[in-house]
Structure formats: structure tokens, C-alpha cells
Amino acid sequence: MDYRVLLYYKYTTIDDPETFAAEHLEFCKSNNLKGRILVSTEGINGTLSGTKEDTDKYIEHMHSDERFADMTFKIDEAEGHAFKKMHVRPRNEIVALGLEDDVDPRVTTGKYYSPSEFKEALEDEDTVILDARNDYEFDLGHFRGAIRPDITRFRDLPDWIRENKDQLDGKNIVTYCTGGIRCEKFSGWLVKEGFENVGQLHGGIATYGKDPETKGQYWDGKMYVFDERISVDVNQVEKTVIGKEHFDGTPCERYINCSNPECNKQILVSEENEDKYLGACSYDCAKHERNRYVAKNNISDEEWNRRLENFKDVPEHAHA
């Protein structure tokens, strides 16, 4: 495989994010890279794809800047680009937690757990393992025994913690996310909230899965990624499928976006049921006048109505 996908972040001071973003975009485009990078005064958060040669140039370029000299890159092999375009955008935060009183992970953050230390924490009955990702990420794959916060956006996590404080009080708390960036800030917030013994998986799931000692053990399912691959394997020892098909509950790891452009909910759906239910998560979405699946496949009104009848046999959860 000649292509690679890079995942990286660094909390560091960038004085002029707008100028940095514009110049960085030009550099990335000139080196045939594609991906999404967020830049703010608090640092950089990126994932991009390119050939081995082009990604090597990018890594070398970043490491030559003293602000990013020690930045860690998590690298996956790929068969081609994982993104369609290249975006570098200035933002208020490089990860959106939206706190009234922001947390600087360079000052306050949870204890770093190496992959082997995290594996020990997974085996410890007195430790709570808290997934800091969104519900649809958790539903595709997660660490065995981890708590699933009922959230669809990272910024909703603090409210969920406050509402479920009783699950965490007096426990050792270790949190994890895809590459580590969300946990840097989130674990710092937990410390500020008064929780004691707060830790985080250093380098995230991506690092744990490649560690030669842990080999991704105790991970069930796949890891959701925010690019065209959608998901990647983590556990090198045993493979399990924990995702459940939206309509029939059978094992499934195929995510699509609901065909209603006003919904866009991510659902696990087989190809057969995507076709049967018009790529939608519910009857209301399937009959939406701008259904993208209907438009893309040139489905006639007669056929559209025929497939809407399929929803009569669907369990209640898919009628919402």
C-alpha cells in the first residue's frame, strides 16, 4: 500500500490561526495531501492522507517547526486517499468541548496511561473506563466494560457527567478516545470538577491497537474513524462484531448517513436493507421530499411508495 493516513494533534500556542491556516493549506495542496485540519490559538488537530513520500514530507515539515517538534503522528497504511478534499480551518477550539471556563491540557490534564497500564486498568474492578466519544462511535466498537455516555456530540459530555455523577464518585476514572485529543481536555475538566484519580489512554485507541504488548486486547468491534474508511480494526488477537443492524438487529459494521438531508443520522445498515428502506433511518425520513437515495437511484414515485410499505414490518424504534 503506497498511501498512508496520518492522525495527529498538538496543544501549543499559534498566535495567528487565520494566517497559519491559509499558509498551511497551500503547503498541503502543493504536496498532494487531502484531509481536515483544525487550527486555533490552542494548537492543531489534523488527519490527512497522501502517498508515503508526501506524508513523509509533511511530517518532516511539521517537525522542523519548534512548536510541533515533538508531535506524535499515528500512521495507518491505506490503499488510496481517505479524503476527497483538503481543508485547513481556523477555529476557536481544536476540539469542541464548549466550556464556560476552558481547560488548558498543558496545565491541567489526567494522568497518562500507557497501553499496558490501560490494559491493567481494564482488568481492575475498582476502575471505571469511560468512553469520551459519541454514541455512534461506541456502538460500532468499544473497550469491554466501558461506560457509554448517551451523547451525539462531544460538547454534551460535561452535562452527561454531571447528571451521572453517582456512577463515578469515589472510583478511579480512566477515559479514552480515538487519538487522545478529546481526553487531554476532558480529563482535565474532570480534575477541575473535583474527581480524583483521573487518567487517560495516552495516544488513544489508535495507539493501543498497534502496541506490540497489548495488541488491541479487550477491544470489541471496530474503531470509527472520521474519513472515507469509516472504520478500522483494533484487536489483533480476536475479532468480534458488536454493531447491530438498525432494522433487524443482526451483526453489522456498515455505517451510512440517513438519506434525509435534514436528518443525516448515522445508522448501521446492510446493503439489502439500505435498498429496502430507501437509505433512511425511519418512515418519516424515507418519505422526505429530498430523499438522497431516491434521487441518486432515480426511483419512480410508484416504486418509492412501494418501498415505503416495507416500514409496516419494521420494529417501533425505526418509525421515529
Swiss-Prot record:
CDD domains: RHOD_YceA. GO terms for molecular function: oxidoreductase activity, acting on paired donors, with incorporation or reduction of molecular oxygen. Keywords: Oxidoreductase, tRNA processing. The keyword Ion transport does not apply. It is an enzyme of class 1 (oxidoreductase). Catalyzes oxygen-dependent 5-hydroxyuridine (ho5U) modification at position 34 in tRNAs. Its EC number is 1.14.-.-. The keyword Oxidoreductase applies. Pfam families: Rhodanese, Rhodanese_C, UPF0176_N. Belongs to the TrhO family. One of its GO terms (biological process) is tRNA modification. The active site is at residue 177. It catalyses: uridine(34) in tRNA + AH2 + O2 = 5-hydroxyuridine(34) in tRNA + A + H2O. This is tRNA uridine(34) hydroxylase. It comes from the Bacteria. Residues 123-217 form the Rhodanese domain.
